[in-house]
Structures are given as structure tokens and as C-alpha cells.
Amino acid sequence: MKKLIFSFFLCGATMFPAFSQTYQELSERAVAATEQDSLSLAEKYIEQALKMEPANPHNALLFSNLGTIQRRQHRYEQALDSYTLALNIAPRAIPALMNRAALYLELGKDDLARIDYSLVLDIESDNQEALLMRAYIYMRQRNYNFAKSDYERLLKLAPQSYNGRLGLATLEQKEGKYEAALSILNAMIAEKGGEATRLTTQQYAVLYVARAGVEQDMKHVDLAMMDLEEAIKLDASQTEAYLIRGQIYLSQK
């Protein structure tokens, strides 16, 4: 859910004739260095390009890329500053808005993240990632009606969205609508092995854990234990499965 968006600056000189070749070369070298995980070198190239043409409107791309580099280095405040500088130049740049929103969310600044995702949706109303992430924030903030609205909008655009369906099932569970939650999860699990969906074993394990959580809430502990066993069989790294199983064991003492 927290994907980095890196705006690659690979446009040719014919597309942007105003660029000097050196500016273009520095930008391309920054991309190449980033792809090779030479982040400090990439940052150096970007800073040189910015100094060379400080008024260039396409510096928005460079600032956005710089923010992503800084984020990968865990220099979060500097990354926020870079994303904001990008948006000062290009306020409607969706990649920069998405990057900043994801970083705000990572830092626990949910309201600021929600604002940026909302700005994205004002520009591009069918942006599926923005809908998904805003729904997630609304759910965390217990704004369940708004969360449901976003999940439903997302599922109209992408009916088979794994994260959208799982998110809606989680929302139904939080509202105590256990049968509705089970209906969604049962349908997703029943599709296992079908041509319509190609999920990983880890994704299926998450579904079994999610269903076990609903069954636990419904006091159907035997069913929950069966689903937890299946989840662990599919993916032994499912921490949540062990936690729920431990809770069930404790409740039976």
C-alpha cells in the first residue's frame, strides 16, 4: 500500500529544447545512479542540475526524485521539503502528491496524507491508489461512511481489486457486520486457483488470517483455528496468525 513513485527524467532534448545538454545529462545520470542504488551520487547530480538552471519549471521532477532518494535514506524531513518544493513548482503533479502523501502516512500524519490524496482525486477522480489509501485513512480514523464510499468507488473501477475487497471486508468487520465481511472473504478464497485471479500464496494466507479474525469475533473458534492452520501452512511468516491463535488459546483457559 505504501509504493514509491519515482518520476524518471528521460525526456530527450528534442522534447525540451530549452534544456541545455549538460542539464539533461546530469538528470539522466541521476536516474542511472538511482537505478544502481548509488543514492548519494544521484543526489549530487540532481543538486548540480538544480544549481545550473534554478528557474527551470521541470525542476519539479528533480525535486520529486530528490525527495524519493532522501526518503529511501530515511531523511524524512528533507524528503518532505523536497516534495513540497516540487509541488510549489507544479501544484498538480500527481506523482509528487502521491509521494508526499505516502510519506505523511508513514510518519503518522494521517490528516496531511488524506489532504494530499484528496488533492489527487480532485485532479484524477479515478486514481485507484489514492482511493484505496484515503479509504484506509478514513477507516483508521473511524470515519466508516467515508471509508466505505471510497472502497465502493474503487471497486466500481476495479471489481477484482484485492486490496479494495480486503479493505471493505475489514471495514465490515470493524462495524460488526460479520456476515458481510465473511461474504467478501469467502468469495475471495473460493476464487483460489481460478483464472480470474492470480494471487500469491502469501496473499491467500492473509485472506485466511482475515477470515479467522472475523470468526474469532463471532466466537467460532474452531473455524478460526482451521483457517489459521491453513494460513500458516501457506505462509509461515504470518505473524498475525500466531497472535490470533495465541489469543484463542488464552481465551480457552
Map each language-model feature to its residues.
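N-terminal leader/linker segments that initiate helical-solenoid repeat arrays
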Residues: 10, 18-65, 72-77, 81
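Canonical tetratricopeptide repeat
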Residues: 65, 99, 133-136, 167, ...
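Helix-start (N-cap) detector for alpha-helical repeat units in TPR-like alpha-solenoids
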Residues: 23-24, 57-61, 94-95, 128-129, ...
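Short coil turns that delineate tetratricopeptide repeat
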Residues: 54-57, 91, 125, 159, ...
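Register position in tetratricopeptide repeats
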Residues: 35-36, 72, 106-107, 140-141, ...
